Regions:
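Transmembrane beta-strand segments of Gram-negative outer membrane beta-barrel proteins
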Residues: 29-30, 155-168, 183-188, 281-282, ...
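N-terminal periplasmic "start-of-domain" segments of outer-membrane beta-barrel proteins
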Residues: 29-60, 93
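Face-selective signature of the C-terminal outer-membrane beta-barrel domain
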Residues: 186, 232-246, 266-407
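Periplasmic-side early beta-strands and strand-to-turn transitions of outer-membrane beta-barrels
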Residues: 160, 178-265
Length: 407
């Protein structure tokens, strides 16, 4: 089926908008590239769109994108632990307007989520030029993943030299540096948090050597490492690479905070991209993303009997588009292709909640593969000084072992 939309936008000619509360929530000036797929003044964009600069996000007191955006209207941020831990996935999540699984997260216009899970808590604000948020359905240009909206993080082409060291209680440590080297720039960071002790009420019992013991959940030591490298060859070509690593522990404790069962999470992500953009309206990106997770756990009374799980999720693809402009109209047409693969290996305890349980046989799932091919376009026509009409359409072909599907 063909997804399309027609928008008739009327723009008010006054150039200033005032609000009594939280003026930074109504930043309407500036150039937006996310809402329509090409550069357009925010005031002339017929969408619920807001742009935050990296400096505005720093004013929240946060050090990363996720924790800065959670203070902004219409952005929902979920996590479980004090260091943005989340049970099982190890990731914090952002959604717009409360639509679960319907927020598409982009970094420099390239998808940066794995099954609607992202690591924006790893992205240091020192690297961010601006964040563009489009609330509401962005599915016409971006597909069904953008039902709730789109978050596009634009990183800096060049960084200033900077160094940050901070420390606090509970084992909190923060180290970050950015280095500008002409055409190249580098950002490094590590963030640490100590153990918390019990953070929940009694949740049930675990059978430890045959005895039922009440248990509580607490978080152990955690670390986040981040590396980003950019190289701008010239005004048209740019290469960027980003590495995130999150390593933390979660514990089932007894009432005295002695560890009964110990869970470890090692989550690593790689993002690589080559981007091309020229003055003739051509824009193309080739990208590769990978996420690997390992999460073993064991009972302290039987540490050699280890339950484990490993997963590997990869994405690679290209997106290219061409924009034509005239005095009266702007047209865009683009194509994209993406391939995703996923596999999971694990070996679980045969009996849940029992330290004496034996392990099941190892299980293997995948490699599963999915191919997504898209054609999209839009036409923006000025009808008068205050009115434009915009027609947009997108066709998706999704191919997998489970069958093909058109959207």
């Amino acid at each position: 089926s063909l997804m399309c939309a027609v928008i008739l936008g009327t723009y008010f000619l006054s150039g200033t908008v005032y609000a009594e509360e939280s003026l930074s929530e109504f930043v309407l000036d500036g150039i937006n590239v996310t809402a329509l797929g090409y550069e357009k003044n925010n005031l002339d964009t017929p969408a619920d769109t807001v742009i935050y600069t990296g400096e505005q996000l720093k004013e929240t007191g946060a050090g990363d994108v996720a924790n800065a955006l959670k203070y902004k209207g219409g952005v929902y941020f979920t996590n479980m632990g004090p260091h943005d831990q989340n049970w099982i996935t190890g990731s914090s999540q952002i959604n717009l307007r409360g639509i679960d699984g319907g927020t598409l997260v982009l970094i420099n216009g390239v998808p940066a989520s794995f099954n609607n899970v992202n690591h924006l808590d790893m992205l240091n604000l020192d690297e961010v030029e601006r964040v563009e948020i489009v609330k509401g359905g962005g599915a016409v240009l971006y597909g069904s993943e953008a039902l709730g909206g789109v978050v596009n993080i634009i990183t800096k082409d060049q960084m200033k030299n900077s160094l940050r060291v901070a420390a606090g209680n509970k084992g909190q440590r923060d180290y970050a540096a950015t280095i500008g080297m002409g055409k190249a720039s580098l950002a490094l960071g590590r963030n640490e948090f100590g153990s918390t002790g019990n953070m929940t009420e009694r949740l049930g019992t675990k059978k430890i050597n045959g005895t039922a013991v009440p248990y509580y959940i607490g978080f152990g030591d955690s670390k986040k490492d981040h590396l980003a490298f950019n190289y701008k060859f010239d005004d048209r070509f740019k290469f960027s690479y980003m590495f995130n690593k999150k390593k933390y522990t979660t514990n089932y404790n007894d009432v005295n905070e002695n560890i009964l069962q110990h869970f470890m999470y090692d989550d690593r992500e790689h993002y690589a991209q080559i981007a091309y953009n020229d003055e003739n309206g051509w824009d193309a990106k080739i990208y590769y993303n990978q996420r690997r997770i390992e999460n073993p756990d064991y009972y302290v009374v039987n540490p050699t009997n280890v339950e484990w799980e490993k997963s590997d999720h990869k994405q690679y693809g290209l997106d290219t588009k061409k924009v034509w402009r005239s005095d009266k109209a702007t047209g865009l047409i683009g194509i994209s292709a993406k391939r995703e693969t996923y596999k999971n290996d694990n070996q679980k305890f045969k009996t849940f909640g029992d330290s004496s349980s034996i392990l099941k046989d190892p299980a293997h799932f995948g490699t599963y593969a999915l191919n997504n091919y898209s054609v999209y376009g839009s036409y923006d026509r000025k009808l008068s000084r205050a009115t434009n009409i915009i027609f947009s359409a997108r066709e998706d072909l999704i191919m997998s072992e489970a069958g093909d599907n058109n959207e």
